Amino acid sequence: MRAAVALLTAAVVLGVCTTSSTGIDTPVSGEVTVFAASSLTDAFPQVGAEMTKANPNARLTFNFGSSSTLATQITNGAPADVFASADEANMQKIVDAELTDGTPKAFASNRLQIAVAAGNPKKIAGLADLARSDVVLVLAAPTVPAGKYALDALAKAGVTARPASQEVDVRAVLNKVSLGEADAGVVYVTDVKSAAGRVTGVEIPPQDQVVARYPAAAVKGSKNATLANRFIDYLVSPNGQGILAEFGFSKP
């Protein structure tokens, strides 16, 4: 039994079910806790809501945060049943610790975009503008996927940027830009989509782009392995993929 530790993430609780789109019609029940990357904050509750329509006797609790923080919590004994990471490196930490129940499944991909204040008042046109002295830039910390991806993209573009701050996760970057506390931040396309009207997205060209790949796995010792694996199956089902696409995610 893994010891419970304090969770540093926000929790969302939803009823969960299966649907025929998963290929499994048998109802499921019980509870599971899903540790998920912060960029999934909008999409995963909707996935859970759709699953709820068929079986309200099961429940998902979502804990969202940076993938690196969640991976550390799991290796320290946090009671997670499913881990959904925004990168393969943090999932590999769980695999190496022999804490996965089965092979992780890729369920989505994402790409980067520059989030700027609505209307783009600083006329930021690309990554090179992030090095301008009149642009207040924020990035996610390099220890979290979005931060590492941002640095990789800047390196590809040959840009040396000096962020005013390094945030705990990608949603913190988005919030600073949307609140006017920063002029720009490198986030995911899905983040810009979620903040439509509050920020404007500036495209990053293909040659400088970095693709984020999202794997999910059941955590060994889950209190409800059947439901944990059923949720992952739903993510890769046509219905699950359709919901993720609505939020701007691409296929894995």
Task: Name each model-derived stretch.
Residues 1-15:
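Sec-dependent bacterial lipoprotein signal peptides
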Residues 9, 17-53, 68, 72-75, ...:
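Exported/periplasmic ABC-transporter solute-binding proteins
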Residues 32, 58-60, 112:
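Conserved beta-strand core positions
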Residues 57, 79-80, 182:
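Short, high-confidence coil segments that cap the C-terminus of an alpha-helix
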Residues 81-85:
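Periplasmic-binding protein-like
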Residues 100-102:
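Short, P/G- and charge-enriched loop/turn segments at secondary-structure junctions
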